[in-house]
């Protein structure tokens, strides 16, 4: 047995109500008389339906995109096959390689390495200008203006 018709108050806000309203507006779009008295003109109701249809379509597209993303994420639990040509041409893919850190320790010291690698400024014909030490204290900051 089919359920009875819904009360009119249930049809106002939901998608079924919007579908019902659009069915009422089909004769209005054809140029015939419309019995819907919502306080809006026929053109305003048609514009409202167009806007609501656009919003519904964009929400549906967003839902489809999210669903595809979730399905792809669930499908990538096993490692993928990687084309070796892509790895060679575009660099190393670290998530698929087993990298281990390498520590090198040496007890030998080279005499040349103990010398600083940066030459002194005097060798570059640059002169460092020393700051003059001033015994004067800086002047106090000006007082704040009254509020």
Curated annotation (Swiss-Prot):
UniProt topological domain (Cytoplasmic) ranges: 69-147
Cellular compartments annotated: Membrane; Cytoplasmic vesicle, Secretory vesicle, Acrosome
Keyword Membrane: yes
Bilayer topology annotation: Single-pass type I membrane protein
Keyword Membrane part of the UniProt annotation: yes
Coiled coil, from the record: none
Keyword list, A-Z: Cytoplasmic vesicle, Membrane, Signal, Transmembrane, Transmembrane helix
Signal peptide: 1-31
Designated name of the protein: Transmembrane protein 210
Source organism of the structure: Homo sapiens (Human)
Gene assigned in the entry: TMEM210
């Amino acid at each position: 047995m089919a359920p009875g018709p819904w009360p009119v108050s249930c049809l106002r806000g939901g998608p079924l109500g919007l579908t019902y309203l659009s069915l009422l507006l089909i004769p209005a779009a054809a140029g015939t008389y419309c019995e819907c008295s919502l306080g809006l003109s026929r053109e305003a109701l048609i514009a409202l339906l167009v806007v609501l249809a656009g919003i519904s379509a964009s929400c549906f597209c967003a839902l489809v995109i999210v669903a595809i993303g979730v399905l792809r994420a669930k499908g990538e639990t096993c490692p993928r096959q990687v084309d070796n040509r892509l790895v060679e041409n575009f660099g190393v893919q670290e998530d698929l390689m087993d990298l281990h850190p390498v520590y090198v320790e040496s007890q030998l010291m080279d005499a040349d390495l103990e010398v600083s690698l940066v030459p002194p400024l005097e060798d570059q014909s640059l002169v460092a200008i020393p700051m003059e030490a001033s015994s004067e204290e800086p002047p106090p900051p000006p007082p704040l203006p009254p509020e």
